[in-house]
């Protein structure tokens, strides 16, 4: 689960990570009021959306006066902000973060993330922080410091010193930086985060360190332990179809293609998307209904995919195990009759009660295209578009 920058900074404050003074605003007047309360200019007016690259997209402005703060707030609030992470459709800006400007001596990069390859935690840092960190990582990866932390032993003093020395911090800033990184690690672990990112982490002219930006991603599977964090979820920032799918415990991710697919099992779903691409088409989604899906869950999954206007055909790929083919077929028939099928639907089923499942589909009167195997299914759905 992603949260907004202003929410992430509130968490930072709770754990003793220094951030600029500021406040969230939902209107131009609120933004001006926050700016007035900061006691002087410049102030920074920042769009609040769940995407990076806001500065390059025009969503971050430095205001030198109240007049500029008002103007920038009016320009950013309500705009459709397009960044490399939003896609061409962009995101509407519905809230702002207004913060006190800082005297920046140096911009750095700092993050903590889960490294699934080593089943550990990695601290990443760089002296090249700021808007071009992606370019730095791609073209000069040697400038990225990586320190692996064993979660069983936790953060140790030598990890803190290794990162601090790697960032080239002056001696006067090392103690404060070590405290910041230690607190950040504590926040990461206690809140079941998958990513914490500060870009930029700044070194001020008086050798202080401060998080000028904040990104926090929380493991959605751990939210049952964090009822307070669940309240930070902003459904307006999420895909409406993904929100709908989550209500029915369906694993759904909306993509850019035009072939919808329904599969049971994450691995089989990814293989299905690969073979759709191999056949010359593009998957419109990832949809795993799970092994324990009921007919109702299947019905909801099919209805969600049919509501996606990009979808021009659907591929259903089911291997019946815990989810029997007859149960799946009943769900498909119910959903199709309720929604009305106006696009080609290719079905490939194997496994438990497959003959009964095929019988249910055949007797339904629906115009479904049967496939003998996965390759045949992909070729038929690609040809049907």
Swiss-Prot record:
Mg(2+) binds at residues 199, 213. It is an enzyme of class 6 (ligase). ATP binds at residues 46, 53-55, 99, 102, 107. One of its GO terms (biological process) is succinyl-CoA metabolic process. One of its GO terms (cellular component) is succinate-CoA ligase complex. It catalyses: succinate + ATP + CoA = succinyl-CoA + ADP + phosphate; GTP + succinate + CoA = succinyl-CoA + GDP + phosphate. InterPro entries: ATP-grasp, ATP-grasp_succ-CoA_synth-type, ATP_grasp_subdomain_1, Succ-CoA_synthase_bsu_CS, SUCC_ACL_C, Succ_CoA_ligase-like_bsu, Succinyl-CoA_synth-like. Residues 9-244 form the ATP-grasp domain. Substrate binds at residues 264, 321-323. Keywords: ATP-binding, Ligase, Magnesium, Metal-binding, Nucleotide-binding, Tricarboxylic acid cycle. Binds 1 Mg(2+) ion per subunit. GO terms for molecular function: ATP binding; magnesium ion binding; succinate-CoA ligase (ADP-forming) activity; succinate-CoA ligase (GDP-forming) activity. Gene3D superfamilies: ATP-grasp fold, A domain, ATP-grasp fold, B domain, Succinyl-CoA synthetase domains. The keyword 4Fe-4S does not apply. PROSITE patterns: ATP_GRASP, SUCCINYL_COA_LIG_3. Its cofactor is Mg(2+). Belongs to the succinate/malate CoA ligase beta subunit family. Succinyl-CoA synthetase functions in the citric acid cycle (TCA), coupling the hydrolysis of succinyl-CoA to the synthesis of either ATP or GTP and thus represents the only step of substrate-level phosphorylation in the TCA. The beta subunit provides nucleotide specificity of the enzyme and binds the substrate succinate, while the binding sites for coenzyme A and phosphate are found in the alpha subunit. Heterotetramer of two alpha and two beta subunits. This is Succinate--CoA ligase [ADP-forming] subunit beta. It comes from Desulforapulum autotrophicum (strain ATCC 43914 / DSM 3382 / VKM B-1955 / HRM2).
């Amino acid at each position: 689960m992603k949260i907004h920058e202003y929410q992430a900074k509130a968490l930072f404050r709770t754990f003793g990570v220094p951030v600029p003074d500021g406040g969230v605003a939902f209107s131009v007047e609120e933004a001006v009021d926050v700016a007035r309360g900061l006691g002087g200019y410049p102030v920074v007016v920042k769009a609040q959306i769940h995407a990076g690259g806001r500065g390059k997209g025009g969503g971050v402005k430095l205001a030198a006066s109240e007049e500029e703060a008002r103007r920038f707030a009016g320009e950013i609030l309500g705009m459709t902000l397009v960044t490399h992470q939003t896609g061409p459709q962009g995101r509407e800006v519905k809230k702002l973060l207004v913060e006190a400007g800082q005297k920046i001596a140096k911009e750095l990069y700092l993050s903590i993330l889960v490294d699934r390859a080593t089943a550990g935690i990695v601290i990443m840092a760089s002296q090249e922080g700021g808007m071009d960190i992606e370019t730095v990582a791609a073209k000069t990866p040697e400038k990225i410091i990586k320190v692996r932390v064993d979660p069983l032993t936790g953060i140790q003093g030598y990890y803190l010193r290794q990162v601090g020395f790697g960032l080239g911090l002056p001696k006067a800033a090392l103690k404060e930086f070590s405290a910041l990184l230690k607190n950040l690690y504590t926040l990461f672990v206690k809140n079941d985060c998958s990513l914490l990112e500060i870009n930029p982490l700044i070194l001020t002219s008086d050798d202080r360190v401060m998080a000028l930006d904040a990104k926090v991603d929380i493991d959605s599977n751990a939210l049952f332990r964090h009822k307070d964090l669940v309240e930070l979820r902003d459904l307006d920032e999420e895909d409406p179809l993904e929100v709908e799918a989550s209500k029915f415990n369906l694993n759904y991710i909306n993509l850019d293609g035009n072939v919808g697919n329904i599969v049971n099992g994450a691995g089989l779903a990814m293989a299905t998307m690969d073979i759709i691409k191999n056949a010359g088409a593009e998957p419109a989604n990832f949809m795993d209904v799970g092994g324990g899906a009921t007919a109702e869950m299947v019905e909801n999954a099919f209805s969600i995919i049919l509501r996606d206007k990009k979808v021009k055909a659907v591929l259903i790929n089911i291997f019946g195990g815990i989810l029997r083919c007859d149960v799946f077929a009943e769900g498909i028939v119910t959903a199709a009759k309720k929604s009305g099928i106006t696009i080609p639907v290719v079905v490939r089923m194997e496994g438990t009660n497959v003959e009964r499942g095929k019988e249910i589909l055949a007797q339904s009167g629906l115009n479904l295209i049967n496939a003998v195997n996965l390759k045949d299914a992909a070729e038929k759905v690609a040809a049907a578009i």
